[in-house]
A protein has these predicted regions:
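Short mixed-charge
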Residues: 145-147
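Structural signature of tandem-repeat unit edges
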Residues: 5-19, 29-42, 52-65, 75-88, ...
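A structural signal for leucine-rich repeat
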Residues: 118, 138-143
């Protein structure tokens, strides 16, 4: 679709769009911001993989799934606030986002692949908008959430979990 396009800088996807093809914006090296509408439920695999200048993502309240490598190598991304609708973050979703230092997860998330934040070396903590007891029910599959990164703590609304 737009993969490898160098002219795109900002994308505001129309609210009528319900689906975007896998890898559609892959390696769009000048893309800096994206607004994802409420109608999009799945951020498909590799959708923004390699968008090295992407520094702003506004997620619609309908997003439920973040796919494999969805934001891999988005090296300018510093903050990610996932809406309450997100239930699943796939493997390597934010792999090698070397500037990522803040992530906020919704309380009703079910699965965060342990490899989702591999090589996000500035990310030392995750903000979880649920309780410590609720965090215990979040699956990281077979890999711990601090796999190949520097995450040391999960900040919950009622305290911290050191890992």
């Amino acid at each position: 679709m737009f993969s490898g396009c160098t002219a795109l800088k900002n994308i505001n996807i129309p609210s009528t769009v319900k689906d975007i093809s896998r890898g559609a914006f892959r390696n769009d090296c000048n893309l800096t911001s994206i607004v994802i509408p409420n109608a999009i439920k799945v951020i498909k695999d590799n959708l923004f993989d390699g968008c090295s200048k992407l520094n702003s993502i506004t997620f619609g309240n309908g997003v439920e799934i973040i796919g494999f490598d969805a934001f891999r190598k988005c090296s300018s991304l510093t903050n990610v606030y996932l809406p309450d609708s997100v239930r699943y973050i796939g493997s390597y979703a934010f792999h090698m986002c070397k500037s990522l230092c803040k992530v906020s997860l919704p309380k009703d998330i079910k699965t965060v692949s342990g490899s989702a934040f591999v090589k996000c070396n500035l990310l030392t903590a995750i903000d979880y908008r649920g309780t410590m007891e609720q965090w215990k029910t979040v699956s990281t599959r077979s890999t711990p959430i601090n796999y190949k990164n520097k995450i040391k703590v999960i900040h919950c609304i009622d305290g911290d979990i050191k890992i």
